[in-house]
């Protein structure tokens, strides 16, 4: 900042207006500061109090501000400019927008500022300008590195090896192509072509001729039946007609397995001991002779079953006495 533009030291109310804060907030801050200062005054030495009273004068305030400005201005002049920063060096070659021309007075001021600066700053500026990036320098550096690599013996061997490999890989394979072209590429044989080939085979012709000879031979005719054989066959057929075939024994229907526990408990699945083997044999004979079986209901007991079986084959002439004789003796 320039000395002329720098504002002088202001009192409390002027500082509040200069900063732009509200008066209420500024007054509260000033009151708190004055209260703290009054609390610290008894502990301050008399020399410091004298300096504090001198600080209220305008001449003292101006001298302090001038000293501050001179001290910081020297530091600002020693510092490097933003234009010489390394981050802006790469953009130095790019076209810039036309700016205002500098007058003679501006040039003199810049020269004076450079002369006032230390020689170290000039050296830094020269170094930063020398390290400017450009595509031309990058290409030249790469070419120089390649030349250095090629001059080394290991690099020469590697390039020679790569050259030989490329020559071998790029040679045309004429001989292999001729062999590949000589191989026929016809389709696979079909069923008709295989059959035609088999027909042309001489062995197949011999086998086919033998089969034809066997088929061409006349088959032997069956001998004519004699006069006695005719009558013998007729007698056999009459005997078979007189003795009819026995009717097939019908299979007993099995009781289907119960689906619930209660049916299994209250249903009779086996024959009780009351039926003797004699009665069972009689029952088989009657069923084979008659060819009809009576269906047994599930709710019948063994005693009812036995009686029902007998009633199924009783005639009108039978009596209760005859029925009782057929029962077992132990009843």
Swiss-Prot record:
It is found in: Cytoplasm, Cytoskeleton; Cytoplasm, Cytoskeleton, Spindle. Keywords: Cell cycle, Cell division, Chromosome partition, Cytoplasm, Cytoskeleton, Mitosis. Residues 154-165 have a biased composition (Basic and acidic residues). GO terms for biological process: cell division; chromosome segregation. Its main location: cytoplasm. It comes from the Eukaryota. Transmembrane segments: none annotated. GO terms for cellular component: cytoplasm; spindle. GO terms for molecular function: microtubule binding. InterPro entries: She1. Residues 90-127, 150-183, 206-331 are annotated as: Disordered. Residues 267-280, 288-299 have a biased composition (Polar residues). May have a role related to the spindle integrity, which is essential for proper chromosome segregation. Belongs to the SHE1 family. This is Mitotic spindle-associated protein SHE1. It comes from Kluyveromyces lactis (strain ATCC 8585 / CBS 2359 / DSM 70799 / NBRC 1267 / NRRL Y-1140 / WM37) (Yeast).
């Amino acid at each position: 900042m320039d000395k002329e533009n720098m504002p002088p030291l202001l009192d409390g109310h002027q500082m509040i207006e200069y900063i732009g804060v509200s008066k209420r907030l500024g007054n509260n801050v000033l009151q708190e500061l004055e209260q703290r200062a009054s609390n610290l005054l008894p502990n301050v030495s008399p020399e410091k109090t004298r300096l504090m009273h001198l600080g209220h004068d305008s001449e003292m305030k101006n001298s302090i501000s001038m000293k501050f400005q001179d001290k910081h201005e020297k530091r600002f002049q020693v510092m490097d400019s933003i234009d010489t920063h390394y981050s802006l060096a790469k953009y130095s070659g790019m076209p810039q927008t036309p700016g205002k021309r500098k007058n003679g007075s501006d040039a003199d001021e810049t020269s004076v500022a450079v002369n006032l600066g230390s020689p170290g700053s000039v050296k830094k500026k020269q170094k930063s300008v020398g390290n400017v990036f450009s595509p031309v320098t990058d290409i030249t550096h790469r070419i120089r590195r390649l030349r250095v690599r090629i001059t080394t013996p290991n690099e020469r061997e590697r390039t020679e090896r790569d050259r030989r490999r490329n020559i071998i890989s790029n040679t045309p394979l004429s001989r292999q192509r001729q062999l590949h072209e000589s191989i026929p590429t016809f389709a696979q044989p079909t069923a008709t072509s295989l059959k035609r080939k088999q027909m042309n085979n001489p062995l197949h012709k011999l086998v086919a001729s033998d089969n034809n000879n066997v088929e061409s031979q006349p088959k032997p005719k069956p001998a004519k039946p004699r006069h006695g054989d005719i009558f013998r066959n007729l007698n056999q057929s009459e005997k078979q007609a007189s003795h009819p075939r026995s009717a097939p024994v019908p299979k007993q229907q099995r009781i289907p397995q119960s689906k619930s526990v209660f049916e299994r408990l209250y249903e009779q699945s086996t024959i009780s001991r009351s039926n003797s083997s004699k009665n069972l044999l009689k029952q088989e004979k009657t069923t084979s002779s008659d060819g009809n079986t009576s269906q047994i209901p599930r709710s019948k007991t063994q005693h009812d079953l036995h009686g029902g079986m007998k009633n199924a084959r009783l005639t009108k002439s039978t009596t209760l006495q005859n029925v009782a004789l057929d029962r077992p003796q132990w009843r």
